[in-house]
C-alpha cells in the first residue's frame, strides 16, 4: 500500500496525532511525514469538535460506510471487516464504583496496517497507559501491537472495577452478618453497575475472541494469542460478575428477612405491653363508670389501695408472661 502524507491527516483540533517509530516509541506527526506500515499513524479525535467532524465526513482515507460509525452512531461493542481495514467499537470503564454506570465510555476506531483513527466524546482513561508507554519507548511497534495493548488496557480497567465491586459486596455481606442494613439504594446501585457491566462486556469479549481468530494481515500469530488471552481474562471477569449478581440477590433476600424480623420483634413487644396493661385498663375503666359512685371513694386510702392493686396486678401478669417464656 502507498504511503500517506502527514498533511492528509492533519486535523487542527485533534486530541493528538502520533507517528509510531516501529521500535515502541512515537512522536507528534508532522505534515512532511510519510505514513506507511513500518511507521503507522495513530490519530485520536473527539468527534464533537467541528474540524474533526468535518475531517471524518470528507477525508478519502476512510470508507464511506464507517464515517457514521466513527461519528458516534455505533454503541455496542462489535467488529466489522471492511476490505483491508477493520471497524471496531469498544467500551471502557471510567470513574469509580460510586458513580452511576448507565453510560460506559465508548471508543470507536478504524484501522489498517498504516492508519489508526480512533474517536470518542468523553476521555478514555485506559488510553493514557498506551500513550505513556509510547512516550517511554516501551509501547507498540505496529498496528497489531497497538490494538492488543489497547484491549489489554481496557480489560485491566474493567478487571479493577469488577474487583472493587467484589470488595464492596464482601463489605456488605460482613455488615449483614452484624445485622447492619446498608443505606437505602446502595445495593440497587451496585446491582445496576453489575448488570450494565455484563451487558457491554459480554459482546466485548466476543469482539476480542473474533479479533484473535480473524486472519488480519497486520496481526501476527503472537498478537492473536495475546488477544485470545485477553478474551479469556475478560471471560473470567464476566464469570465473577455473574457470581456477584447472584450474591446481591441473596443479600436482597437477607435484608428483607432482617427487616421483617425487626418489624416482628417490635410488633411482639407492643403486643406484650398491651397484654400487661390490659387488665389495669379494664379496672380503671370499670371504676370510672360512676354509675353508682366510685367504689372506695369515701375511704381515705382508697386511691392508694387501688394503685397498689394495679401494681400487683401488672406485676402478676408480667411474672406469668415470664414464666410462660413470652418475655
Curated annotation (Swiss-Prot):
It is found in: Cell inner membrane. Zinc transporter. Acts as a Zn(2+):proton symporter, which likely mediates zinc ion uptake. This is Zinc transport protein ZntB. It comes from the Bacteria. Keywords: Cell inner membrane, Cell membrane, Ion transport, Membrane, Transmembrane, Transmembrane helix, Transport, Zinc. The gene is zntB. Residues 295-300 are periplasmic. It comes from Enterobacter sp. (strain 638). Residues 1-273, 322-327 are cytoplasmic.
Amino acid at each position: 500500500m502507498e504511503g500517506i502524507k502527514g498533511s492528509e491527516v492533519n486535523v487542527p483540533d485533534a486530541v493528538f496525532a502520533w507517528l509510531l517509530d516501529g521500535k515502541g516509541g512515537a512522536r507528534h506527526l508532522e505534515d512532511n511525514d510519510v505514513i506507511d506500515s513500518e511507521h503507522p499513524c495513530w490519530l485520536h479525535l473527539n468527534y464533537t469538535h467541528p474540524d474533526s467532524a468535518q475531517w471524518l465526513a470528507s477525508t478519502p482515507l476512510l470508507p464511506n460506510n464507517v464515517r457514521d460509525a466513527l461519528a458516534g452512531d455505533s454503541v455496542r461493542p462489535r467488529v466489522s471487516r471492511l476490505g483491508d481495514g477493520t471497524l471496531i467499537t469498544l467500551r471502557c470503564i471510567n470513574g469509580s464504583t460510586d458513580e452511576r454506570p448507565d453510560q460506559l465510555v465508548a471508543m470507536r476506531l478504524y484501522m489498517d496496517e498504516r492508519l489508526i483513527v480512533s474517536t470518542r466524546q468523553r476521555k478514555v482513561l485506559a488510553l493514557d497507559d498506551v500513550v505513556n508507554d509510547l512516550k517511554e519507548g516501551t509501547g507498540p511497534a505496529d498496528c497489531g501491537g497497538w490494538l492488543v495493548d489497547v484491549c489489554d488496557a481496557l480489560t485491566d480497567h474493567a478487571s479493577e472495577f469488577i474487583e472493587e465491586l467484589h470488595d464492596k459486596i464482601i463489605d456488605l455481606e460482613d455488615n449483614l452478618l452484624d445485622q447492619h442494613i446498608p443505606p437505602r439504594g446502595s445495593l440497587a446501585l451496585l446491582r445496576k453497575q453489575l448488570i450494565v457491566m455484563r451487558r457491554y462486556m459480554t459482546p466485548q469479549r466476543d469482539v476480542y475472541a473474533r479479533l484473535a481468530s480473524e486472519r488480519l494481515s497486520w496481526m501476527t500469530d503472537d498478537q492473536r494469542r495475546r488477544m485470545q488471552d485477553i478474551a479469556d481474562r475478560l471471560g473470567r471477569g464476566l464469570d465473577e460478575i455473574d457470581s456477584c449478581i447472584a450474591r446481591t440477590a441473596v443479600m436482597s433476600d437477607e435484608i428483607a428477612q432482617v427487616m421483617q424480623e425487626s418489624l416482628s420483634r417490635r410488633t411482639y413487644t407492643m403486643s406484650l405491653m398491651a397484654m400487661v396493661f390490659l387488665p389495669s385498663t379494664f379496672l380503671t375503666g370499670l371504676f370510672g363508670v360512676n354509675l353508682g359512685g366510685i367504689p372506695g371513694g369515701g375511704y381515705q386510702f382508697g386511691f392508694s389501695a387501688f394503685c397498689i392493686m394495679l401494681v400487683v396486678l401488672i406485676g402478676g401478669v408480667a411474672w406469668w408472661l415470664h414464666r410462660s417464656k413470652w418475655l
